[in-house]
């Protein structure tokens, strides 16, 4: 029991962790492990986007970067995630934001929240081989339970637009 108690004392009472990676790479699974280990609150971009903007209609689903995924909608989604995280951190909770964070400016905005609340910041960089991502995407689509609208086409575009972590973000 002493070892268990000691291990709990090493866990910060507050932290902000964000995921980084393309869709279907396993970000939600990694995020859930941290949520379970720390008792953290998790905010998912897939849910918050639809809460904020509604479901995407079938016409928009065929337009890459359109509908609820246009740049303004994405910016609003990240602003919402960051506002939720800031409130939770100020209330003393550890937080995990489950989103792609493909752009450096998105990650920088999350870091600024951690900085302003005096909270440790962690980036969970999630990667997997293309074949594994394709398999996971097919499984997810077959199950039909995941809120993500990502398709193989979306994943290709994400790979192309992903801004790698900077040396400062890796350190």
What residue ranges belong to the model's regions?
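Hydrophobic positions on the alpha1 helix immediately C-terminal to the Walker A/P-loop
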Residues: 30, 34
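Conserved lysine of the Walker
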Residues: 27
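Extreme N-terminal, non-catalytic leader segments
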Residues: 1-16
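Hydrophobic anchor at the beta1->P-loop junction of P-loop NTPases
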Residues: 17-19, 45
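P-loop (Walker A) phosphate-binding loop of NTP-binding proteins
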Residues: 22
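Conserved substrate/cofactor phosphate-moiety recognition/catalytic segment
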Residues: 35-93
